[in-house]
Amino acid sequence: MSAPKVQLLLTGNELMTGDIVDSNSAMMAQVLKDIGLGVNRKVTVADDLALLVNEITYMASTSDILIINGGLGPTVDDLTAQALALAIEDELSQHPQALTHLTNWCHQRGAELNGPNLKQAILPKSCQIIANKNGSAVGFYVRFNHCDIYCTPGVPHELETMLIKQIVPAISADLPSDLITDVTRLQVFGLGESSLQKIINEQLPQWPTAIDLGFRAGMPLLEVKLTTNTKKGLALKPIWHNKLADVLGDHLISEIQDKPKSLAEHLLHQLQQHNLKVTTAESCTGGLIASKLTEISGSSMNFEAGYVTYSNKMKTAMLDVPAKLFEQYGAVSEQVVVAMAKGSLIKSTADLTIAVSGVAGPNGGTEEKPVGTVWLAWGSIDNIKTQCLLLPYKRVKFQEFVAAIGLDLLRRYQQNITSIPNYIAERAFTDQ
């Protein structure tokens, strides 16, 4: 039996004008793909009742599953419930379950349950409620002829929770028993999508068509998906999974088991296994590396201290960086960042450290050290490694990448990985 036909209908004037970028359809497509369903049509329409009725009528007649996104709010341009009722020739009525949810939602927040809010409880009479723990608007479901229609909120995190926790399980329960869905997700760092695709094309040119290979760019990790919906693909997958892992090498962080983990989580896990403590010495990142480590529950077992020494004066006062190094080499230099790393280890009782000093911009760059230049030092007191990079990003993105690279370098160090990837464009100061 073939897979059900899935279509998406998104509504909102903001989507049509570009005031809001549509990320919901991409997320829905990814989640549905994980259960073996592809989206064969997506339509975006303005908040226009006639347009919505026409699209719902047509899409419900040409699909097995229709997910409508947006238009569930309390304002005059939220038209999904009304349009659906007209399309399926149903009546609108106040739904008791939706009203109870709305009443509780307003009461918990000290808000007034007024006329506009009550609109969110006026739904097609035949619908079933889909609970929304994250917002005031419930979702709802109707079966119309051969089509299952799900109406969902436009707020991304409300949609994602509803989709994953309720809609996908409901869809999965009705899928054909012979429909195979097998998905493996890998986390990769230090390679971009185009670079990775080039490597795969060169080293794995015979990649089987039975296994779909997909990429999902993140910040900072890249997710690689191996998906198959056939018995042939299921048989081939372990072989090609291993081949891909070999090609990825030490860029492969992990296989995602439940939910993705951050670089900081992976590093802390390694430190916990070996009962090691880490410290940080940061200048250009302003404590971001320490923040990423300490936002994880249980990090106090392995995180010793974080030194944010933004000025040269405080680098000397807190980490004993010799003042002469600033005069001779500048704050953004290998000599200074090594001194910061050693100082952080001496001042604390940590076993490992990561230290960074760079030019985050947009000002402060020179011909010798342009904006985006950063020196990193990491390791233990008797084995400090260094690297200099030029990261051509705006300030916030620069800081994010420096923090991620610092965590990855320490991960590699702890795993005894001697190779250091050229994360983007390595600088070599031959005059020092």
Swiss-Prot record:
CDD domains for this protein: cinA
Give the domain of life.
Answer: Bacteria
InterPro entries per the record?
Answer: CinA, CinA-like_C, CinA_C, Competence-induced_CinA, MoaB/Mog-like_dom_sf, MoaB/Mog_dom
The record's family statement is: Belongs to the CinA family.
- PANTHER family of this UniProt entry? NICOTINAMIDE-NUCLEOTIDE AMIDOHYDROLASE PNCC (PTHR13939), NMN AMIDOHYDROLASE-LIKE PROTEIN YFAY (PTHR13939:SF0)
Q: What is this protein called?
A: CinA-like protein
Native organism: Colwellia psychrerythraea (strain 34H / ATCC BAA-681) (Vibrio psychroerythus)
